[in-house]
């Protein structure tokens, strides 16, 4: 049939490149060696081959005649003109007769327990190591009675193995069963040696466990990914079977690998040469010479050491050592090769030498360049981790990474990238990896003087470790990076980014509505300070947080276990620890925008039931925002000019047990009203921030009568808020904070000599990057019962508020609010000057001043909603002041259903407490 492939041999099969064939000198047909029972190594000895068909007519094949014992081609005439070649019988005899310096002075002899990763990292792996016993080495082997026939049983007789014809120093292939037959025959026509039987994929692999040290250091064990496109290199388990006089000439193990040998039975002799620069240069020159086999390389160097490895001994040969091996008696040995981090530079140097010498792929480390890319990727991570942990990498690793970078760069050059592109893993970006690795090693070299962290101190090595350790180590590192990032405390930048998004979301909300039902009320009421003549300033700062509420839910009560931690932000626990220790440094000042066209004071009167309505609306619909940064980016009408001085201040401390008991007693009269709102109380945080959509005006605080205090008590009871205890002495002072998502008003009133003094101090604003300070002078018996106009301003009107208002009065009067109306009226105001200025801790505590400042970050605070203004209890503003904005929506409204009951309770409380202690509350 036309186009059909030609067929050969007695089997009439087409040509197969993987099968050895021999040509018949008579019929010129080709035959498979396995079909005609001719081994590959035997074909070299045949002078004329006759196939089975031709053999009948022309007789058997004719063998070559031996004419010498010192040349690879034994048919050459022995005229004494040609030198002895390596591996021949003459060469072996001469080698055994020579004397060499003993390696005893060179070798490091130690026990298995001493050969540790930490030792090699500290001392280096530069000299051969001899371990005379298996104890503590981690090496498991078959018993010394294990024979070549056992190897055949475990591996399989049909396995094709590489065999070296020692006399010719040529390799060939044969079946394992044929080699075993040869080995067991005492009459051996030639010397054959097996040195490359890798059995990791056979049953015999279970009988052998490699030394712990080689497994811990091995690149393949540590860095080769299981899902790699490339076939994983198996070079750790070799069985070496050699008959007497087997010889392997001088060589460096492929890829510059280190190697371990253990002689199970028999004996081997190693001829060792140091890998100095001079010796390596000589070796490369010798290897490329056409007369290589005629020159004994040991004669070219200064010293060649002889090391005898006896039965039961284990020898470790470091990277780059040039060595030859003679089998002085029949021997079976096990060994393995491994790349590692201790000598990266030398490994790369040996690999480049192999390429220059054009070493066949069969004798090179499988996928050497691919594993270098994997190692580079992992070492980049390792260096970053060492730097993150505050350790300087050891010198051997630093030098190795630099050598690796140089090699990777050379492989990526335009003129050679095509040659190396095949071994670049798909999941690696070579250019980016080289750049990042160069950057990290450069930064490591610049840092310099840090303690060196051994990679084997704690039983595992982040740079080189066993497969079990690798998986656990990488999983731990991965959890730490994603670290570990699920449990890691957020950084300031993380918090900033998160809350910037929150601010932007709030800025997209619709403008403020003038309906009181849309306002949010968030308030904090401090307990009265204990009288102290020596620590007034400290007491003011140490007012504790009593309650935190978000979305109408109590999330912290110091008298009850805190259970709902889910409402914390990611960094709130960290802030708990940090906020208590912070001290006030500066505050941010804010200039209020001017306003005009304020209406008459009569138009600002707001029925008390509207205040209750707004409170209920807050409890029903309000939500507290979790924010750590300022959301003071106002609308385009906001004319506030801000300056940042500091973001830190001391947060409030905890109150003592006595104050807690007093608080319990104070809460009894209003506990039933709190139950009306399902036990929900507004947050009592001394440091809760107010938003800065509009600059709030100063609140002026005239004194209160007993009736007004009782009315406020009932009013606050309606809002499910705590009521502070009475002031038992005229000198006692108390603090009260009003917060509703606005800069906090922290007021301290001291009663004495018929006068009241207001004081405030500034706290850190955790969700605001600025502080506001207002100062004003108050005359005696001034008290506020009218809402701040600026808190009722629309964004359009907020810019018209005057920057400075100051009014002084000689007398102030009070009007009692009718009980059926449930609101309070005040005819006169004491207007203090509102002037931003630098914060002064001392002046802030002096009497006659009222400061507006942002709330500080308290350890358990939850941040309040900053999207709407705060509705305040009804008051009056004097006609001399610019009239406040009129809110028509609040005039003439009837109380909502259910408010009558609340008013009845309020009236009852007012009657019960009519003759009680003088109390006040804001």
UniProtKB/Swiss-Prot annotation:
Residues 473-483 have a biased composition (Basic residues). Its EC number is 1.14.11.-. InterPro entries: JHD (IPR041070), JHDM1_Histone_Demethylase (IPR050690), JmjC_dom (IPR003347), Zinc_finger_PHD-type_CS (IPR019786), Znf_FYVE_PHD (IPR011011), Znf_PHD (IPR001965), Znf_PHD-finger (IPR019787). Transmembrane segments: none annotated. Gene3D superfamilies: 1.20.58.1360, Cupin. Coiled coil: none annotated. A zinc finger (PHD-type) spans 6-57. One of its GO terms (molecular function) is histone H3K27me2/H3K27me3 demethylase activity. SMART domains: JmjC, PHD. Residues 199-355 form the JmjC domain. Substrate binds at residues 248, 268. Residues 445-490, 565-607, 622-711, 754-773, 872-902 are annotated as: Disordered. It is an enzyme of class 1 (oxidoreductase). Keywords: Chromatin regulator, Dioxygenase, Iron, Metal-binding, Neurogenesis, Nucleus, Oxidoreductase, Transcription, Transcription regulation, Zinc, Zinc-finger. GO terms for cellular component: nucleus. GO terms for biological process: midbrain development. Residues 667-683, 691-701 have a biased composition (Basic and acidic residues). Histone demethylase required for brain development. Specifically demethylates dimethylated 'Lys-9' and 'Lys-27' (H3K9me2 and H3K27me2, respectively) of histone H3 and monomethylated histone H4 'Lys-20' residue (H4K20Me1), thereby playing a central role in histone code. The PHD-type zinc finger mediates the binding to H3K4me3. Binding to H3K4me3 prevents its access to H3K9me2. This is Lysine-specific demethylase 7A. It comes from Xenopus tropicalis. The lineage of its organism: Eukaryota, Metazoa, Chordata, Craniata, Vertebrata.
